[in-house]
Amino acid sequence: MRLTAKQVTWLKVCLHLAGLLPFLWLVWAINHGGLGADPVKDIQHFTGLTALKFLLAALLITPLARYAKQPLLIRTRRLLGLWCFAWATLHLTSYALLELGVNNLALLGKELITRPYLTLGIISWVILLALAFTSTQSMQRKLGKHWQQLHNFVYLVAILAPIHYLWSVKIISPQPLIYAGLAVLLLALRYKKLLSLFNRLRKQAHNKLSL
């Protein structure tokens, strides 16, 4: 049985709740002592992990829609991507304001050098910003064939974000490994497309070097 447009609309409502409820919980935890001994680290971890969850969920939609034969499910992908960007922005903001502090934002450059995993996080966020900004149908029409080329960069985020997570933890635990494994699995489901993209980029690079 295929999903109807009405059912997809209700699914979107549920996804909005899934994006909003963690924020409400975080606000409650901050105000009621629900965080651990290092609340700043807990906030950063929670916001980053939630962003990663939405990224993986967005990547899951295409293979799920294909294998379950639910084409309308694709309509939820943009919503999941926007929630991923929202939580990634909260993650970056919590680091900039709570760890560095408003008066020490100039130290960000030094931090990027001493903590390379931060560079991966910043690159991922910039890509997500570009994808969120161009996610509308009007931007899709305006960019034409370049729209898909731009949005293929989500696969780079799917590589960089788990590495950022693994690199940022002092002790490797099962959790970051599980999320990294899920990212690898979701990318593996697209191996033909990724191989085609890689060959195309290699050909373009070769042509430019030959000029």
Curated annotation (Swiss-Prot):
Q: Which GO terms describe its molecular function?
A: electron transfer activity; FMN binding; heme binding; metal ion binding; oxidoreductase activity, acting on diphenols and related substances as donors
As for membrane topology, the entry says: Multi-pass membrane protein
Q: Where found?
A: Cell inner membrane
Give the GO biological process terms: protein repair
Cofactor(s) for this UniProt protein: FMN; heme b
**Assigned GO CC terms:** plasma membrane
- What keywords were assigned to this record? Cell inner membrane, Cell membrane, Electron transport, Flavoprotein, FMN, Heme, Iron, Membrane, Metal-binding, Transmembrane, Transmembrane helix, Transport
Q: Does Zinc appear among the keywords?
A: no
Residue intervals passing through the bilayer? 45-65, 82-102, 116-136, 153-173, 178-198
| Cofactor binding, per record | Binds 1 FMN per subunit. Binds 1 heme b (iron(II)-protoporphyrin IX) group per subunit.
The UniProt entry, under PANTHER family, shows:
PROTEIN-METHIONINE-SULFOXIDE REDUCTASE HEME-BINDING SUBUNIT MSRQ
Entry-linked HAMAP family: MsrQ
Subunit-level organization:
Heterodimer of a catalytic subunit (MsrP) and a heme-binding subunit (MsrQ).
Similarity comment: family membership: Belongs to the MsrQ family.
Q: What does this protein do?
A: Part of the MsrPQ system that repairs oxidized periplasmic proteins containing methionine sulfoxide residues (Met-O), using respiratory chain electrons. Thus protects these proteins from oxidative-stress damage caused by reactive species of oxygen and chlorine generated by the host defense mechanisms. MsrPQ is essential for the maintenance of envelope integrity under bleach stress, rescuing a wide series of structurally unrelated periplasmic proteins from methionine oxidation, including the primary periplasmic chaperone SurA and the lipoprotein Pal.
This chain's protein is named Protein-methionine-sulfoxide reductase heme-binding subunit MsrQ
Gene (name only)? msrQ
